[in-house]
A protein has these predicted regions:
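Internal "kinase-insert"/substrate-recognition segments embedded within catalytic cores
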Residues: 92-98, 105-114, 134-139, 151-262
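Coil residues (strongly favoring Ser/Thr
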Residues: 54-56, 183, 285, 350
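Bacterial N-terminal signal peptides
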Residues: 6-15
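Middle-to-C-terminal accessory/interaction subdomains
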Residues: 26-27, 37-39, 80, 84, ...
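Positively charged n-region of N-terminal signal peptides that target proteins for export
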Residues: 1-4
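A conserved helix-loop-beta module that forms one wall/lid of the active-site cleft
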Residues: 116-149
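C-terminal outer-membrane/trafficking sorting elements
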Residues: 415-456
Length: 456
């Protein structure tokens, strides 16, 4: 009898530990570390290989089981790394690769989505809205299934890593420890952050809130670079809290800021100006000062969590730096309402359908993901994708309707000057520099570089 009980226990244990296999409905990323070494931290890369089998999804394969690509692998993320057993990863290929239809680069991330309880739709739809509104660059994101060292890990999202590159944030790259006065004016990418690091720039916002800004690039600063970036952040803060619209518009790209903000309001992301809030600046040239731009968007992990009929800066769960004050500026309000007009009339229904279609392709992989990770730390159950999808769509519709009550249909954007191009070649046009700003003269009229007519 004892032998029978032991045999039965072993059989049940073996059945419970039976490996889960990929659904076969999404591309499969096979990631293998040398000697099966575990990926245990975010700081140290582990050497390994990667190949991607697209199955019948229409994407091109990347490497193969017999010829995988060499890469360096490590963990990534903050709360998503420390708060969940399902871990996100960073991939650095030894050579630039075009991956699942996305432009060539060495650097990619595998987002785990373990913090997303709304059908894994928060980041993908946030990115969709950003692309629809035309922010200068939005990361590409493709759902995949991950096999790590031969073990199925569930549903992941292969995503372009945010970095300065001609195919990503396309600005002049600035070297570490640079001291050249012209070069240090651009190639900056910074982040309003909620995690401390020794290179952070810290200051008190004019409303008394303590703000930390981390530096993505450059990473190692000369004294000249640090003095410049500290002055720039102070100038941006002073302009936001100042009383001169002209000063604000000289340092901040208002249209890009409006687009970035509208994405956050539609997604009701109350942590959007608290962490992972990126800004970048290109190099000044031709006597023209390049403006700071909000973006690219990243991390919608808290989207729709509050579910309140309030602005994202009104009594938020976390401090929302700068945006509450920026939202008081008439020039910003007008730009936001113009972007809202575009979104409301052209994209609100399209994005909803794209979200539904995106969710539907995740159905089988989401079921298997739940089998792998149910019972682990902070598990979010998305096994019933139809319910999770519908909950997300209900919240999206609710937010669109609430914003309509605030803004109506918005303000139809002004038409740009007919026949005017940012870089015209017509012999009747010419560029002029006035008070440090670049303008275009066309048929006796003066336009700014966005193509809008200004007074001569």
């Amino acid at each position: 009898m004892k032998k029978y009980i032991v045999f039965l226990w072993v059989c049940l244990l073996s059945a419970g530990m039976q490996a889960v296999n990929p659904s076969g409905t999404l591309p499969i990323v096979y990631m293998t570390t040398n000697s099966g070494q575990a990926i245990t931290d975010k700081e140290n890369y582990v050497p390994g290989t990667v190949y991607i089998d697209p199955l019948s999804t229409g994407y091109a394969a990347l490497g193969s089981s017999s010829a995988p690509l060499t890469a360096q692998l490590k963990g990534r993320g903050n709360w998503t790394w420390s708060g969940f057993d399902k871990k996100p990863y960073k991939i650095k290929f030894d050579a630039k690769q075009k991956v699942l239809g996305m432009p060539k680069n060495k650097h990619w991330v595998l987002i785990a989505g373990a913090d997303d309880w709304l059908g894994y739709l928060k980041n993908p739809v946030g990115f969709m809205i950003s692309k629809a509104l035309g922010l200068r660059w939005t990361p590409g994101i493709v759902p995949v299934e991950l096999v790590l060292n031969g073990n199925y890990q569930g549903l992941y999202f292969l995503t372009e890593h945010v970095r300065v590159d001609k195919n990503r944030v396309n600005i002049q790259e600035q070297e570490d420890l640079c001291t050249n006065a012209d070069s240090i004016t651009g190639g900056w990418m910074v982040e309003i952050d909620n995690y401390w690091s020794e290179n952070n720039i810290e200051f008190n916002e004019n409303n008394g809130q303590h703000v930390m800004v981390s530096l993505d690039v450059p990473e190692v600063l000369s004294n000249v670079q640090r003095d410049y970036i500290v002055h720039q952040i102070e100038a941006l803060n002073n302009a936001i809290y100042g009383n001169s619209s002209a000063t604000l518009e000289q340092i901040l790209d208002i249209e890009e800021a409006a687009k970035f903000y509208l994405v956050q309001e539609i997604m009701e992301d109350c942590e959007s100006y608290h962490g992972s809030c990126k800004l970048y600046k290109d190099r000044d040239s031709l006597g023209m000062v390049d403006k700071w731009k909000f973006g690219p968007v990243w991390d919608f992990g808290n989207a729709y969590d509050r579910h309140a009929e309030r602005w994202i800066y009104d009594g938020p769960t976390w401090p929302q730096y700068w945006i509450g004050q920026l939202a008081t500026w008439p020039v910003f309000q007008k730009a936001v309402k113009e972007q809202w007009w575009i979104y409301y009339h052209q994209y609100k229904d399209t994005i909803k359908q794209q979200a539904i279609d995106f969710a539907n392709q995740l159905t089988e992989a989401a079921k298997l993901d739940a089998q792998v990770w149910e019972g682990t730390s902070n598990f979010r159950n998305n096994s019933n994708m139809a319910d999770r999808r519908d909950d997300f769509i209900d919240r999206y519709n609710w937010r669109i309707n609430w914003l309509y009550k605030q803004w109506g249909e918005g303000i139809q954007p002004e038409e740009k000057g007919e026949g005017v191009e940012t870089n015209p070649t017509n012999i009747e046009s010419r560029k002029i520099l006035r008070n440090g700003q670049l303008y275009i003269m066309y048929k006796g009229q003066m336009y700014n570089v966005q193509g809008r007519r200004v007074e001569n």
